[in-house]
Amino acid sequence: PHKTFAGLLIMMALGLKLNAKPIPKPLMCLSPYMTIYGRMDDNMIDMNLAKLAVWQDIVDTPVWPGEPIGFMTHTPERVQSSMTTALHAALACSAGVTAATIASSDEAYSKGPISSQARVDTLRAVKDALRFVGNGAFLPTAECELIKEEIHSGIIDVLKTIAKRGDFVASISVIATSQSS
């Protein structure tokens, strides 16, 4: 995630130069990186909270995870899809995000047509999950802080490489090559 986050930071800096008010939208999902490196083998809380914490530490702006939350944790089964969306929404809200993008249970998995019932299923699941957590929070394991530090130092390394080379795409290629060896 550190390469993506470095790219988002660069885009935010460009947005600020254009007098925009950029809002980072980190993914709360199960991505190939997490799968390959086993970052979510134990739970989905630590990595997602670590990613949100990195943003909250390095930028003074609202954080809005999405596209949608829970991406790649959904299946075609509507109840499961609504449930994973609701769990991710509760996790995001307990971490203090400003907003989160959700998708209806049929759209979340297939990006297909959205039915009214699927939309209602997901909204009810999110409502119940938020009510369940209330003012409580999820308790990350000690691994969360280690992941956060790893992401943060990875972002710094990427930005240093980009500054040295002066070319974002070439820098990412160099970083990818050095990580695979």
Q: Which ranges hold each PLM region?
A:
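Anaerobic metallocofactor- and corrinoid-dependent redox/one-carbon enzyme cores
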Residues: 1-181
